[in-house]
Amino acid sequence: MPHDIPADAPAAPRHGDEVVTSRELVMALHRSAIGRLVMLSADGGEGGLGGVELGRAIARAGMSCILIDLTGEERIAAETGIAPGSPGLHEFAENLAPLGEIIHRDSRGACHVVLATGAAPQPDSPDVTLVLAACAEAYDCTIVALDARRMDSLPSLLDEETAIVVAGQAATPDGYATVAGELRSLGVDDLIFMQCAATRRAGRRAPDQPD
């Protein structure tokens, strides 16, 4: 169970008007019903590492957490120290590995990780749906790392217990504004902005929310 949470932790994730740190977001998660976070990178590329940072922070706070990599990139595998050739979603989909064998542990933290191992999987595929359902039963929180250029696949990942996090590693808010604008064009307005530790700047704000 979660533990050692400050009494003044925010009651819910601060949506929209402020960029939060991973620690602030974790404190908020303890008091919310959110069980899944969809992570998008504000840097314009795929496979931002915000999900790795957040997963480690969640695990340190005493919650069980798993990161599902749907980017089809190798950055998350490299950052978490998972050996090349380790099985992932591709092997699971091809019946080459059972679910238990595609779940790996972050070598630098306590978060578990499932890799894409191949082309980026479709979020609404039966295999991804099965993995997400199993993880929802087994973990306090599931993080889904998604390529920001595949926002059209977001609806299949969203429900009343899912939040969208735009994680930034850039030194300016331009990336936040770009991703947020694209999401709003799809009718998605309820966003959380998280600044990754490597480039955190005090007082930086997220783009204004529409009235």
Q: Language-model features: where?
A:
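Short, charged low-complexity intrinsically disordered segments located at boundaries
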Residues: E53-G55, A120-P123, I164
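P-loop/Walker-type NTP enzyme "switch/lid" segment
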Residues: P6-G16, M27-L49, I66-D140, A148
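Short, highly selective alpha-helical patches that border small-molecule cofactor pockets
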Residues: G47-G51, G55, Y176-A180
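Acidic-aromatic/histidine active-site loop/patch
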Residues: M1-G35, P87, E94, A170-P173, ...
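Post-Walker A helix-loop "phosphate-sensing" segment adjacent to the P-loop in P-loop NTPases
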Residues: R56-I68
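A generic structural signal for alpha->beta connector loops
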Residues: G62-S64, A110, G187-L191
